[in-house]
Amino acid sequence: MISPPPTFSFANLLNGSYGVDTPEEVERVRREQREDAEAALRNYKPLPAVDVSESVPRDEPIVSQTVTAAPVTSVDDAFVSFGAEDYLEMSPSELLSAFELMVKPLRVGEVLCSSFDRSLFISSVAMARTLLLAPLTSTRTLKRFEDLVAAIYLKTDFFLEDDGPQTDVSQSDVPGYIFEPGQHSSGFEPPPICAKCDLILYQCPCFDFNALRESCAEKTFSHDYVIEGLDGVIDNATLLSNLGPFLLPVHCSYSKTEDPDFVVDPSLARPTDRVDVHVVQAVCDTTLPTHGNYDDSFHQVFVDSADYSTDMDHVRLRQSDLVAKIPDGGHMLPVLNTGSGHQRVGTTKEVLTAIKKRNADVPELGDSVNLSRLSKAVAERFRLSYMNVDALAKSNFVNVVSNFHAYMQKWPSSGLSYDDLPDLHAENLQFYDHMIKSDVKPVVTDTLNVDRPVPATITFHKKTITSQFSPLFISLFERFQRCLRERVVLPVGKISSLEMTGFSVLNKHCLEIDLSKFDKSQGEFHLMIQEHILNDLGCPAPITKWWCDFHRFSYIKDKRAGVGMPISFQRRTGDAFTYFGNTIVTMAEFAWCYDTDQFDRLLFSGDDSLAFSKLPPVGDPSKFTTLFNMEAKVMEPAVPYICSKFYSLMSLVTRFQSPTIREIQRLGTKKIPYSDNNDFLFAHFMSFVDRLKFMDRMSQSCIDQLSIFFELKYKKSGNEAALVLGAFKKYTANFNAYKELYYSDRQQCDLVNTFCISEFRVIRRTTVKKKKNGCVDSSGVDRRPPLSQFAGGETSKTKVSRQKPASEGLQKSQRESAIYSETFPDVTIPRSRSRGLVS
């Protein structure tokens, strides 16, 4: 007797007896369906024989098959199962893949035509399977399973055309089902059999299940390099230093593309015959229209002499000391005017302006949250998203002593030794020194006509204090790199690099998050996240607690400018943990706002981040502001850009390219000191060559990629970027060509002063005046020749002139002055400019 179904009541709803498909309920429903099917087959009347060979999709030929009229006593479960349970358990992405495989919709961008309907698709699958399993009563041939699902979904004909051949569509069987004539599969797949012992592979002693599990795990750097171990005698630093030459990226060579067969119109051809300074200046004026007329020669004077007003809390000023003058031997002057500024001097007003922007006025954008609970959750998400837990458990060795010794070897010239290191317990670690960066970072926006860039600030400990904390954080960072997953890249150190072999940025979606005011926006929440992550990496808990305690409240002081102010949790831009801490904070915020499993490659460096994925990224970037107190901006349109460099595909290797707009600005820098042998200029030239070393491997495809990225990033013309590459090729060829971009007033003065008297002659106009003792010119210099050669003649002329009337001598002098003024040009050199230029 069939038990009645449970009635609807509040009690049955709470105890789960109503509305829940329990195994007993499913078995009861299947038993009722089986009984109904057996009763229907007992009353079944045979139909005329029908050839159903064409309705069965199989490759081998079938002679014929007729539906038997003999009743059966049992019914297979395949007749009563709905066939859609597997699709109901699929995830949305898997169900969408099955929909595209069967229905084959037309994709226009990200839009499907026909649109995807989950309920309609599962119903179509169930109905198609029911039609194939039911006895066929028509003489027409049904479509294949995939085509039948598409026909039901699109509401078209279920049968093939009688005259037309069957469309050859690539199909795969429905997962778990096999359609064969005369029998129905239950979806069971036989297990693999071992070829040696004929046993099931999972029960065979030859099968290594642990090896299969390790091969399925995600590969990390710790699998490639056995960097350390408890039973070895080689420490971490020694092995890394030995592996350094072998871990450098291999540069692939390329062949130059052949010349095209078609002829380019000369009027459309780009000028590539010669590179000139004026062409580069014209490109700069076109790309950066407000930079060509920028001149900050007297900017420092305006700042210090004009009225100044600012609003900051808890600022201490000491103006009893004068700002000492910085000795300056002169700088090289650029030929190009690219908007670069002079070096800034840390005066009181300049420092207050920088502190106002970089350290004061901390934004309060986040909401009130439970810091203790949420910081642990963010640290746990960080560990699961980026780190290989097995590699972290095995890599339990932090080599601090070797790194400390290597760090001290960097300072032999400065005289720093182990005896000079102070006792950290006797030092007040809450006090930080402060200074501004003399070099101002060039801006790429067209705002120099209304705005002046503010210099960045540096908050740092003394060298003796930093040298004791840096080895510990270096060791932790090395261990952190070894335990990262393969898809996570940190472009720093000996293992990682900006160049990625075997990965293409083409046909990928990019995600770049721009975090502004990153240092001063960090608060107590970020400090607690770093504390949990440092403890997970193996940092001793007392040291972690000690380090975080004197970052809760600190005091910065600029001794030169006489400015001091208290700060709290914000990032110290010059201590031993700056880069490591910024990278950890950026990765933790990114993992909380986005699911990292959707990305194929993740790059982090300080406050810069870049991610690549095959599908459009899905996440909630608003949490950067509401939770982490950051001013975040998702860059649109997104380009592969990180650390002020573009990524492009060169010779099957993803390499970085420095943006041309910043390199143009660096060609007009004003910070190169003057030297007689051009040592500083040559060092600047070698830095320029190192940044543009990728040009030797560039092809036309790389130039096109860089032009497109340039247009998308800066909203400038890509043709200008391609034109500047020719200038870069010229100035990186040799040092003599690079010297054309700079000059010095001192060099021109020395050039003028090296002229010989015989080569450089200046004729002066003489004006004879009546004197009592003789004739003297207007310059006051006696032009009489030496007495040893013309003593007699000069004396006789003087005596004769005394006997002549005064009027006659005056007329003669006037006639001589008129003759000299008409014959000789008036060229004079003032004595005060004897060391200057002559024009």
UniProtKB/Swiss-Prot annotation:
<dbReference type="InterPro" id="IPR047309">
    <property type="entry name" value="Bromoviridae_RdRp"/>
</dbReference>
<comment type="subunit">
    <text>Interacts with replication protein 1a.</text>
</comment>
<dbReference type="GO" id="GO:0003723">
    <property type="term" value="F:RNA binding"/>
</dbReference>
<protein>
    <recommendedName>
        <fullName>RNA-directed RNA polymerase 2a</fullName>
        <ecNumber>2.7.7.48</ecNumber>
    </recommendedName>
</protein>
<comment type="function">
    <text>RNA-dependent RNA polymerase which replicates the viral genome composed of 3 RNA segments, RNA1, RNA2 and RNA3.</text>
</comment>
<keyword id="KW-0808">Transferase</keyword>
<comment type="similarity">
    <text>Belongs to the ssRNA positive-strand viruses RNA-directed RNA polymerase family.</text>
</comment>
<dbReference type="GO" id="GO:0003968">
    <property type="term" value="F:RNA-directed RNA polymerase activity"/>
</dbReference>
<dbReference type="InterPro" id="IPR043502">
    <property type="entry name" value="DNA/RNA_pol_sf"/>
</dbReference>
<dbReference type="GO" id="GO:0006351">
    <property type="term" value="P:DNA-templated transcription"/>
</dbReference>
<keyword id="KW-0693">Viral RNA replication</keyword>
<keyword id="KW-0547">Nucleotide-binding</keyword>
<keyword id="KW-0548">Nucleotidyltransferase</keyword>
<feature type="domain" description="RdRp catalytic">
    <location>
        <begin position="508"/>
        <end position="621"/>
    </location>
</feature>
<dbReference type="InterPro" id="IPR001788">
    <property type="entry name" value="RNA-dep_RNA_pol_alsuvir"/>
</dbReference>
<keyword id="KW-0696">RNA-directed RNA polymerase</keyword>
<dbReference type="GO" id="GO:0039690">
    <property type="term" value="P:positive stranded viral RNA replication"/>
</dbReference>
<dbReference type="InterPro" id="IPR007094">
    <property type="entry name" value="RNA-dir_pol_PSvirus"/>
</dbReference>
<feature type="region of interest" description="Disordered">
    <location>
        <begin position="773"/>
        <end position="824"/>
    </location>
</feature>
<dbReference type="GO" id="GO:0000166">
    <property type="term" value="F:nucleotide binding"/>
</dbReference>
<dbReference type="Pfam" id="PF00978">
    <property type="entry name" value="RdRP_2"/>
</dbReference>
